[in-house]
Every structure is written in C-alpha cells, then in structure tokens.
Design a protein with these regions (language model features):
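Bacterial N-terminal signal peptides that target proteins for export
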Residues: 2-12
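Bacterial N-terminal signal peptides
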Residues: 11-21
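Sec/Tat signal peptide C-region and signal peptidase I cleavage site
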Residues: 22-26
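Acidic, serine/threonine-rich low-complexity disordered tracts
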Residues: 27-127, 168-269
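Hydrophobic, well-structured mid-protein blocks that either form specific transmembrane helices
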Residues: 121-162
Length: 269
C-alpha cells in the first residue's frame, strides 16, 4: 500500500486487525466469530471544507463455497463512491479472498479503480517447511504486470486477516497495547501494528449505539510507522467494525455501519 489517500475499503477491514496475534502464523485456528451468510454494509463520508458529505457505500459478505476441490470461505468486499464524491475522488473497488475452513489464506484478488488509477492485485499463498510463500502480482493502469515472490510468516491480505483475526480475544489488553503483523497486497508486504485505546460508545447509521473498542492502525511503508486510521469495533464475540475515522490529503473520511445481518451471535455491545 502506497498512500493514505486511497483504499477506503481497506480501512473497513483493518478494523479487525487488532485481534491478530503477534505470533500468528499459517497454522489453522478455530473460527469462533462468524458464520457463512454474514453481511455488513456501511455509509462512507468525506469531510470537505469542514462539511461532512455522504460519499458512497461499502459492503462485506462471507459465504462457504469450494476452492480447488476443498471447502473454503469466500469473502467479498465492494466499495463505491457516489456521483457527488466522484468529483473529488473516485472509488470502484471489488476484493475477493478464499481461506480454508480453519482460516488459512489461499488466494486474494483486488480490482481497484481509485482516482485515475486502475490496478489488479493478486496474492497466492503456499505453505511449506513451516514458512509462508506468497506470489504477488500487480497489473497497473498501463497494463504492465509486476511480479514478486515473498517468504514471510505472519502475513495476511486484508480480507483473510479480517476473517482469521475475529476469533482472537483482546479482553486482557490495556491502553497502549500493541499487536504486530504483516499486510500483503499485489506489490508489497509491509509491517503494521494496532494500538489499543480503551472502550467507548459509538453511534451507527442505524439508530443504534454500540459499546466499542477503540484502536489505531499504523503501517510502515518504508519511511517509519504512520497512523492510518482510528476505528471502533463491537466489544462482543462478533468483533464487528462500527465506525472508522481516516485522515486523507483532501480532508477526513469515515465509514459508519448501516446494516448487520447473518451475524453468528446477537449483538451484545
């Protein structure tokens, strides 16, 4: 990832990264947070000259399917700005990922139209000798493909970490606690961490208030760690992101929950 000025869809997903373990690897784990059929939707907002405007929407869904002959979770994320926001910054993104029933990543693809850029990212995972081998591919706006092979444990794309990390329990965390991991896309595998900031109540766009965990996401793109976003996730077994605040070059942005359905547990936050 190269800039904080794009990938709003990623911000929806990093809201779950706080649950990842420092020592996480490709070893499978039991899913305790979601079930097939879960669907989440959000309103996107931009702050333009101190005025918040409705900028578009995003949605995330998870289903059980088949991938190369085995049962797998398929997760899909779409994000789209509306006509008004398109005047400032266009987003038309579709992301898809597959992971095993015990949450080991298999394949990831991201088709993005952000501003004037059109990229296609792919990540293929293979595990051998206790190591995670990743084949990265990015096709840029000019149509040229760029390839890279990376071997690095504790690495996940945004969708696979969203699914995997929701089953971790942060109940023992204290203010300032940090969790480290690596984030991979079609070009880079960057170190990142989440810093815990306590609990607070947050309003959704569905006339409901939620008790949430406050978290800040930092990523190192080669020039030191920078804070990308602050976000709030339900303080219950579902660990669903409710609100995400993001600073962009042209102003601020946020995503607020609109609809939650197919959740594994009743919302108790």
């Amino acid at each position: 990832m190269n800039s904080r000025t794009h990938k709003l869809e990623n911000v929806l997903l990093v809201a779950m990264l706080f649950l990842a373990s420092v020592g996480a690897s490709a070893q499978g784990m039991t899913n305790t947070a979601f079930k097939s059929g879960e669907y989440l939707s959000y309103n996107l907002y931009f702050n333009w000259k101190f005025v918040w405007i409705k900028a578009g929407n995003a949605s995330f869904s998870t289903t059980m399917t088949r991938y190369k002959g085995q049962n797998a979770y398929k997760s899909s994320l779409t994000a789209k700005t509306n006509a008004r926001a398109d005047k400032f910054y266009v987003i038309r993104d579709i992301l898809t990922a597959y992971c095993t029933g015990n949450l080991v990543p298999l394949f990831y693809t991201k088709n993005t139209h952000e501003g004037n850029r059109r990229n296609l990212d792919e990540v293929t995972y293979q595990f051998s000798g206790g190591k995670c081998h990743m084949k990265l591919r990015r096709r840029k706006t000019d149509g040229v493909n760029h390839y890279k092979n990376v071997v690095r444990n504790n690495s996940f794309d945004m969708l696979s970490i969203f699914l995997r990390a929701r089953s971790w329990n942060p109940s023992g965390w204290r203010n300032g606690y940090k969790v480290g991991f690596n984030i991979v896309d079609g070009k880079n595998c960057n170190p990142a961490y989440i810093q815990y900031g306590g609990k607070t109540n947050v309003d959704g766009d569905n006339n409901r208030k939620y008790r949430c965990l406050k978290l800040s996401y930092y990523e190192n793109e080669g020039k030191g760690y920078k804070r990308i976003a602050t976000f709030y996730v339900t303080d219950d077994q579902n660990h669903i992101p409710i609100l995400i605040d993001l600073n962009l070059k042209f102003g601020s942005a946020k995503a607020k929950i609109v609809n939650i359905r197919g959740n594994r547990y009743p919302i108790r936050a």
